[in-house]
Amino acid sequence: VTAGRESIATYNEPLAGARKPSWSGVRGPRGVDALRSDGRLLKYVQNVSELRPAGEADDALMAFQHRMCISADDDRIRWPKPPKYDPDDFLLIQRALEASGGSADFFTSLPPAALPGYPGKKKKYCLCCGITIGATDQPSLNSGWASAGWERRKQITDEHTYFELGSFYYLANDPRVPLPVRTSFGKYGLCADEFADYGHVPPQLYVRISNRLVGDAVVTQNSIASPRTKSDSIGVGDWSFDEHMTGKYAVPVAGQAGKLEVMLEGNFWPAIANGSNWYDVPYSVMTPKRG
C-alpha cells in the first residue's frame, strides 16, 4: 500500500505531487494576514517552507471533515462551545473577515451554499467542503492518519470536531465578528434529532483518502482517461479528478518585506476527459501485483 501524493514522475501524471499555493478556483478574499500580532503564525496555517517543491512526492492527504447535519429549526442545538475553546485559535476567520470588508460570503459551508439533503418541512442541511479559507475542510489536521493506530485516529477526529464546532461558535458569538455575521450564523445550529448519542455530531469522520492498494494495475490520471473502457471492468466511476486542499500556507507577499498572506494548496477538479467524468474500474486494481 501507499499513502500521500506520488510524484509526477512516478506514473507520469501532470496533476500529481505537491503543488504551488495558488488562487485557482478559490473563493474569498485575498491578502489575508497569516500572522498574529506577536509575529507567530496563526493556528491552522503552515509555513510554506514545509511544502515540497511542485511535482514532488509528499505525505499530504486532502482535507477530512465531518459532514455535519445543521438546522435552522427552532429546536436546533445552539452552536456549542467546544471543550478547551480558545477564541484566538480562530483568528484566521477574523483575518478573513477583515480582508473581505466584514462579509462572510467566503465561508461556503452554510446556506445558501449548504447542500440541501433532507426532504420535508424541517430545515436541515448537510455541510460540505469549501475551496476557501473559511471552510469546514481543514487540511493538515489529518497528518499521520494513514499509519496511525485507533487511539491517534480518535485524537485526529477530536481535533476536527474542535475546529468545526469552534469555527461556528466563533462566528456566532465572538464580539470581534460583525453583528450581521453573528446574527446570520446564529440562525443555525446542530440538528436536535440527529446523532444525539454523539453530541449531535456524526461519529464518522469523512476520510476522503488514506492508504491505497498498489495492485497489479494502478488507476492513474492517464489510465482513467485513455482508454476509458477496460476489458476487465468491474464497475464504473463517475466523478472528476477532485482533490480537496491539503494545506493553508503562509506565503511571502511580493514587494512587502515580512508580510505573509494565507494561500491554499492542493485543490483541483478538472474533468476526466472531453468534459465528462465516467471511467471504467479494472478488476486488476484489486489483485496482488505480480512479480
Task: Name every feature range the model reports, one short phrase each.
Residues 1-291:
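Flavin (FAD/FMN)-binding glycine-rich loop and adjacent Rossmann-like elements that form
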